[in-house]
A protein has these predicted regions:
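Glycine-centric low-complexity repeats
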Residues: 2-326
Length: 326
């Protein structure tokens, strides 16, 4: 637990919280440590790193632990608690003791790229995980940190006279499943939703003098995200349309063109996928209707009723108040 906020405080209380330094000296708790992009970290905020140090400097202070979500290459769908903390991917500030969850300040430091998957809008690239209620949890996203939802796939074009299929839904960036978390996005840091895929185009038909011509619709474009949405397949079996193009991290893919049967029957084009500021388009309609565009994920999601404090000096693109985390 955090140390008391007033009255007499003993050296043994300080040692119980922060661990025993080699000299058993108050002065040896003047530490300045860098972890990832976090530099000059004191033992806890307000404890001196040099100069005079006194017992009252430790009032209300607690052990600080940085969870490592900054080392290595890109990752997908990771929980700070389950995947990192539980596997000891962390740094205890000061280095005087082993990790301790109860009452500690847990700093989840993100300074690389994380992506989500495409299976559910609630799925997040990074989750805080659930912690002891006495712990203080903050997420610090450094200048190279990116937390990105996945883009939805484009819908398939209508087959012959069939309707186009809807585009896939984008998924989400940061998931908060601990109450009272503070999120700090530093300059250059990014949290971004994944965006929906475009709908597939509808099939077309033309009849005259015993002729019955049909044409399939084009596939929808993929939504922006990481991973990005794939372009939708065209309808087939009649005059085939074209596939939609895939998106990338920031830009949506285009819908594919509809099929052309003898310049008489025309399938409709697929819709463009979604990107920040532009919702995914539905597929065009011919004799059959186009599929709807997929919805967007959220930049930040939280469990219902949870409070989150957001300090943003970087970039957050997408809804910050969506509920439901998985």
């Amino acid at each position: 637990m955090a140390l008391q906020g007033s009255g007499q405080i003993s050296f043994s209380q300080i040692e119980n919280e922060f661990g025993q330094n080699g000299e058993r000296s108050l002065g040896d708790y003047r530490t300045s440590q860098s972890v990832g992009e976090l530099s000059n970290l004191p033992l806890d905020s307000g404890i001196p790193t040099s100069g005079q140090i006194k017992f009252s400097d430790f009032y209300s202070k607690r052990l600080n632990i940085v969870v490592d979500m900054h080392s290595g290459g890109d990752e997908f769908r990771k929980s700070a608690k389950n995947d990192k903390w539980n596997n000891n991917n962390l740094t205890v500030i000061g280095g005087f003791r082993s990790k301790k969850e109860d009452g500690s300040k847990i700093i989840v430091h993100v300074n690389k790229k994380f992506g989500s998957d495409k299976s559910s809008v609630n799925n997040c690239a990074v989750r805080t995980g659930s912690w002891n209620s006495s712990s203080s949890i903050q997420v610090d996203i450094g200048g190279e940190g990116q937390i990105l939802g996945a883009g939805g796939d484009g819908g398939q074009g209508g087959v012959c006279l069939g309707g186009g299929q809807p585009g896939g839904t984008g998924t989400s960036g940061l998931g908060i499943d601990h109450n009272g978390v503070t999120v700090n996005v530093l300059s250059g840091g990014i949290i971004r939703a994944g965006f929906g895929g475009g709908g597939g185009g509808g099939g077309g038909r033309q009849t005259d003098k015993g002729s019955d011509r049909r044409a399939s619709g084009g596939g929808g474009g993929g939504g922006a995200g990481f991973p990005a949405g794939n372009g939708g397949q065209p309808g087939n079996g009649c005059a085939n349309g074209s596939s939609g193009s895939g998106g990338n991290e920031t830009t949506a893919g285009d819908g594919g063109g509809g099929g052309n049967n003898g310049n008489q029957a025309y399938g409709a084009s697929g819709g463009e996928g979604g990107q920040f500021g532009e919702a995914a388009n539905g597929g065009g309609s011919s004799q059959a209707g186009g599929g709807s565009g997929g919805g967007d994920g959220a930049a930040i999601r939280r469990n219902s009723g949870f409070s989150v404090t957001i300090n943003n000096s970087g970039t957050i693109q997408g809804d910050q108040n969506a509920t439901g985390v998985s």
